[in-house]
Each structure stands twice: as C-alpha cells, then as structure tokens.
C-alpha cells in the first residue's frame, strides 16, 4: 500500500477532518471547506453518487446530515445509492459507518490509476467526486489524469464528474502552505510539486465535452460533463 494511503489508519482518520478542513484548507490553501468546498460538493452531488478517495467521508457525511429532517419538514433522504472508493479499506469502512446508510452504501477498494474492475458491471452514477485526491496520487499531472478515463465508464451521459486538488504550480503558496507542502511531499502523502491546473484541464477536455474550472486560493475546483 502506498504511504499516502497507509497513513490513514483508524486513529489518524479521526484527526483528519480537523487538521485538513479547519486548518490546512483555511490557512494553508485559502480555500475553506465550509464556505467553498462543501457548497461546491453539495451543488453537484446527485442521488446516485460515487465518492472516490473518500478519506473520512467528510463530504458525503455532511450531505447526508443536511438531507435529514430540518425545520419540521422532511426532505428526500440522500443518497439513493452511494459507492465509496478508496485504496485504503480503513477509509471506506469508516466512511460507510459515518454516513449511516447501510442499505444503499457499497464500498470498493481500488486504485484510480488503474482500470477499475467494477466498471464491468456497467452501473452508472449521477455524479462522481474526486475531492482532495489528485494531489495525493503519485506521478506527474499527466499520469494522474488517467483517473478521469478510468472513472468515465461509471458516469451517466447526463452526469457530472467533479473534484478539487491542491496545486504545486501556477499558484503562490504562503509560508504555512509551503511548510505543509514540503512536509507532505517529504512523507509521500502529497505528490503535487509539479501539478499545474492547465494539465488537469487539458486532460479533462480530452474525455469530456463540457469542462469548467476555477482556482480558489491554491486549490483547483473542476467539473466535467458530457463524456465523449
């Protein structure tokens, strides 16, 4: 197992949410999860969703909570179907437990840099997410972008693939960000010193007809529709 996946054992996962979403994303990457990342996720996630590189399940857990009873009115429960994909089975197991929807949740241990066997089932989803995943994958921007093609068979024709990643090039990091970048890359958790937004956008445009992106702070947010 790669170090970036091995790091997330059952104990470390509990600290992940606080460190990443309350400290690193705010002070290091200037792309706060609460005001940017979570609204971005919520606006694109569909009833049938595949979450790739799920980590602790922060994003699907948040959407699940928001779909429950609020202000005395019942909202349709999310999800209809949820597939949690990660290289580390600890991540998918913990995320599935936290989401709390066992009847409609499945888990899959897979490497997105390789063709995903489950694609042979021809099940497709309304949405696929890669939130804070690409900067953890080993290799160049071009090799990481193979993940888009591997995930494309899972997406409905009218579905959306979306995600976010911390950039190494094309942005100016502050001192704290540079420190976290150095430490994370030295430990093999990140592999993003060479990651430029244009590389990912070009790769997405090869697999999808409609691609949108924006850089917030040091983070690339992207959406891709109409798989070709």
Curated annotation (Swiss-Prot):
One of its GO terms (biological process) is methylation. Its EC number is 2.1.1.-. GO terms for molecular function: methyltransferase activity. Keywords: Methyltransferase, Transferase. The keyword Phosphoprotein does not apply. Pathway: Secondary metabolite biosynthesis; terpenoid biosynthesis; Mycotoxin biosynthesis. It is an enzyme of class 2 (transferase). The keyword ATP-binding does not apply. Belongs to the methyltransferase superfamily. Methyltransferase; part of the gene cluster that mediates the biosynthesis of the neurotoxin verrucosidin, a methylated alpha-pyrone polyketide that inhibits oxidative phosphorylation in mitochondria and thereby causes neurological diseases. The carbon backbone of verrucosidin is synthesized by the HR-PKS verA, and further modified by the other verrucodidin cluster enzymes. This is Methyltransferase verB.
């Amino acid at each position: 197992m790669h170090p970036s996946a091995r790091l997330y054992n059952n104990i470390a996962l509990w600290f992940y949410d606080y460190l990443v979403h309350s400290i690193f994303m705010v002070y290091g990457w200037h792309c706060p999860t609460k005001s940017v990342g979570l609204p971005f996720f919520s606006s694109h996630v569909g009833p049938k969703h595949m979450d790739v590189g799920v980590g602790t399940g922060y994003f699907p857990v948040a959407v699940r909570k928001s779909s429950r009873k609020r202000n005395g009115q019942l909202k349709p429960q999310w999800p209809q179907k949820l597939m949690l994909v990660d290289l580390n089975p600890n991540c998918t197991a913990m995320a599935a437990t936290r989401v709390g929807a066992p009847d409609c949740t499945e888990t899959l241990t897979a490497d997105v840099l390789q063709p995903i066997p489950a694609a042979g089932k021809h099940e497709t989803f309304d949405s696929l997410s890669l939130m804070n995943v690409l900067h953890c994958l080993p290799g160049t921007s071009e090799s990481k972008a193979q993940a888009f093609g591997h995930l494309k068979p899972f997406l409905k024709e009218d579905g959306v693939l979306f995600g976010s990643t911390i950039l190494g090039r094309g942005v100016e990091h502050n001192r704290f960000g540079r420190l976290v970048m150095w430490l994370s890359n030295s430990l093999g958790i990140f592999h993003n010193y060479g990651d430029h937004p244009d590389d990912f956008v070009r790769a997405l445009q090869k697999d999808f007809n409609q691609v949108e992106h924006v850089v917030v702070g040091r983070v690339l947010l992207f959406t891709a529709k109409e798989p070709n």
